[in-house]
C-alpha cells in the first residue's frame, strides 16, 4: 500500500463580525496484492474544498468533494464512475451551563448526483443517497 493525504484550513478575511474560512483536502491510496492484482474496495483519488463564514456561535458553509473514477477495482469488482458532491449547511451553537446546544441544517448532495462508492459492498445494488435535508439538535456535554 502507498498513498498521500492532506488537509488545510485557513482564514481568508474577517468581516461582519466573523471570519471567511477556506479549506482544501484530498487523498490518494493505491494497493496491490502479492499476486499483483489490485486490492478491492479502495477509494479513488478525492479532492475537496470548503468555504465558510463563521462567528463564535454561527457558521454558514458549503463544501464540494470531487472523486475520480475507480478504474482499478480489484478482481471480481466493477469499476465505479467519478462524481462531484456538493453540500450546503448552517450551524448555530448556544452555550449553556451544562454544555453546548448545537442546531444544524445541511442540504446534502444538492445536485442529486448518483454516487456509487468503490468502498461499498452494496455499490452495484444501491447508490448513496441523492439530495437530502438533514436537520437536528446536538447537545455536547
List the predicted regions and their residue ranges.
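Gram-negative outer-membrane beta-barrel transporters
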Residues: 1-73
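Residues on the lipid-exposed face of transmembrane beta-strands in outer-membrane beta-barrel proteins
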Residues: 6-10, 49-53, 88-92, 105, ...
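Short glycine/proline-enriched turns and hinge-like loops at secondary-structure junctions
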Residues: 18-20, 80-81, 99
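C-terminal beta-signal and adjacent terminal beta-strands/loops
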Residues: 24, 71, 92-141
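Active-site lining segments that contact anionic ligands and/or coordinate catalytic metals
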Residues: 57-59, 83-87, 100-102, 132
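Low-complexity, intrinsically disordered short segments enriched for Gly/Pro and polybasic residues
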Residues: 62-64, 78, 106
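Short, glycine/charged-rich beta-strand-loop motifs at protein surfaces that mediate ligand recognition
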Residues: 73-80, 87-91
Amino acid at each position: 500500500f502507498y498513498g498521500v493525504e492532506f488537509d488545510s484550513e485557513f482564514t481568508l478575511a474577517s468581516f461582519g463580525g466573523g471570519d471567511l474560512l477556506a479549506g482544501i483536502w484530498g487523498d490518494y491510496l493505491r494497493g496491490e496484492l502479492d499476486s499483483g492484482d489490485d486490492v478491492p474496495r479502495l477509494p479513488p483519488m478525492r479532492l475537496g474544498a470548503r468555504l465558510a463564514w463563521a462567528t463564535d456561535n454561527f457558521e454558514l458553509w458549503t463544501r464540494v468533494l470531487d472523486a475520480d473514477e475507480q478504474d482499478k477495482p480489484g478482481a471480481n469488482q466493477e469499476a465505479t464512475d467519478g462524481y462531484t458532491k456538493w453540500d450546503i449547511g448552517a450551524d448555530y451553537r448556544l452555550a449553556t451551563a451544562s454544555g453546548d446546544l448545537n442546531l444544524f441544517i445541511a442540504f446534502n448532495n444538492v445536485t442529486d448526483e448518483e454516487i456509487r462508492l468503490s468502498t461499498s459492498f452494496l455499490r452495484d445494488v444501491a447508490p448513496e443517497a441523492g439530495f437530502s435535508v438533514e436537520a437536528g439538535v446536538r447537545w455536547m456535554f
